[in-house]
Amino acid sequence: VKIIDLKETMYSDQTGKFPYLSSRGNRYIMVAYHTDANYNFMEPMKNRTEAQMLKAYQAIFERMKEAGLGVRKHILDNKISAEYKAAKKKNVAEHELVPPGEHRRNIAKRAIQTCKDHFVGVIAGVHESFPMHLWCRLLEAAEMQINLLRQSNITPKILAYAHVHGPHNFMHKPLAPFGCPVQAHQKPGK
């Protein structure tokens, strides 16, 4: 997808219900896409109530701010309440609603599909003894992994992950298959 003149734009939407309730009470994921970084942000939500959506949006927006990503425009689905609109005005200069029936204009739909496909692959690859109620704890690692596979739109020679977090140090955070059983050796007497 070639993006032209959408600097500092954010798209967001929520996924459908996850089949398992997580140990933290989460059932949904809010996915946000930042056009400059080409980065997909994922934040778990307990339900699709206004309070949970605002909490997830605020968490994602704070992460964008910490990374130095500007957001001047927020494009979202055509369902939005006055409370949600007011919270956005504090953070973003303008917002735009995708017209009903024009979901192909919401890049977040494509980001959701990419994240869902990747996360299904992650879940399919976990060990058979992995407790599925821990699925939301895999989100951070899945987000990191998916963004290590994408290039930034602003600086195509670096990864989307590096655009947001800086270069990944594989010695500090090695990547192993998610949800795999591990054995830890503990020396006696320590």
For the regions a language model picked out, list residue spans one by one.
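Charged, gly/pro-enriched flexible loop segments at helix/strand junctions
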Residues: 124-188
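Retroviral integrase
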Residues: 1-117, 163-190
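A polyampholytic, Gly/Pro-enriched intrinsically disordered region
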Residues: 114-126
